[in-house]
Amino acid sequence: MKTLTNATDKEEILRRLQAIEPGTQRRWGKMSAHQMICHLADGYKMYMGAKKVKPAPGIVPPAVLRWIAIWSPMPWPRGFPTVPELDQQVDGTPPAQFEADRRELYGLLERLTRRPRDFEWQPHPHFGQMSEESWMRLSYLHANHHLRQFGV
């Protein structure tokens, strides 16, 4: 299973992020390529506690949803609603300058995977408290999902 704990998997994500350009067209969804870069950065900020996000209401218990999203072999569905704080068209960080925003994302990815950690994992709005293993798997899956959205 791919995870950002694995250096090869992390390099794969970094290489694919480098292939994204401001004009890269989405295959589904509403985000632009630049908004996706900011969305991933906001996610990493949330994971590390630098961006506060309210818990999302749901009818499926967080532990069940967490297992389905992180450990089941099913691909993530398209169009799953994001929380407002991570939605660039609502309360997410607005895109500013593409290369600067991408550099920030790279820096956040490095900080996320650095050992020892200089932060504590924050609860996920849909999945609640998670282990480092789950966070690193989710981090890979989230980036992979959006990179597939843009065909890279």
PLM segments and residue spans:
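N-terminus-centered regions that define maturation/targeting leaders and the start
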Residues: 17, 33, 40, 105-108
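Globin-like tetrapyrrole-binding proteins
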Residues: 4-7, 17-18, 84-96, 105, ...
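Conserved, structured core segments of small domains
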Residues: 25, 76, 80, 101, ...
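Short, helix-capping/interhelical loops that line the mouth of catalytic, cofactor-
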Residues: 49-100, 104
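A short secondary-structure junction motif
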Residues: 20, 47, 112-116
